[in-house]
Amino acid sequence: MTKTKIDLKVVLLGYASVGKTCIVTRYTSGQFGDTHTTIGGAFSSKRVVVGETEVLLGIWDTAGTERYQAVNVSYYRRANAAIVCYDLTNRESWEKVTFWAEELTQNEPEIEIYIVGTKLDLIQQGDIKAVPEEEVKQTARRYKAHIFETSSRTGENVSLLFQTIAEDFCKRTNNGTNPVNSNPSNVVNVNTQTQKKKGGCC
């Protein structure tokens, strides 16, 4: 039986048209479609279970705002995890990854960063990766980030990405390394009749 509920804020960042909205749509609805560019921000949510913990992933898609070279800080304020996307076949989209990683670490130093290469299906069909794997690894090491490659078209690694984000967060919370981003109200013990606030995952 689930004993604990946690709200986990996730933000998606990246160059225009790398497929951020497609990732969210694939994950939350299981569907794929070539979507139009989102202006401003869009919000979606989905519940996952990690052990005895129920995690509500609140997913903020910041599509469109990257046109101004700076995302409004309010989008990722108090975020627990950030998915920084780039198109595996597009070098220009990769050049923005460092920009977003710097923005995040300066404004939310406790945030966990996931560098996600999109459109993996194109690579599997014969396209060439625009960024050498070692360069991606070096950038990930610099920001202590995780690396994923996904395809919204086939769904490959999309669910795994979000499940890993939830699991990593619960591990950090249990270890005391990221106490719900200094916001204990994110965690609610639902094992008693009166819902009592608590500071970590069970």
Curated annotation (Swiss-Prot):
Keywords, comma-separated and alphabetical: Autophagy, Endoplasmic reticulum, Endosome, Golgi apparatus, GTP-binding, Lipoprotein, Membrane, Nucleotide-binding, Prenylation, Protein transport, Transport
Pfam families tied to this protein: Ras
Keyword Methyltransferase on entry: no
GO MF entries: GTP binding; GTPase activity
Lipidation (S-geranylgeranyl cysteine): C201, C202
Motif segment (Effector region): 35-43
Annotated InterPro entries: P-loop_NTPase, Rab24, Small_GTP-bd, Small_GTPase
Topology of the protein relative to the lipid bilayer: Lipid-anchor
GO biological process: autophagy; intracellular protein transport
Location within or outside the cell: Endoplasmic reticulum-Golgi intermediate compartment; Endosome; Endoplasmic reticulum; Golgi apparatus
KW NADP (keyword) present: no
CC terms in the record's Gene Ontology section: autophagosome; endocytic vesicle; endomembrane system; endoplasmic reticulum; endoplasmic reticulum-Golgi intermediate compartment; endosome; Golgi apparatus; membrane
Binding site for GTP: 14-21, 61-65, 118-121
Role of this protein: May be involved in autophagy-related processes.
Similarity field: Belongs to the small GTPase superfamily. Rab family.
Protein name per the record: Ras-related protein Rab-24
Source organism: Dictyostelium discoideum
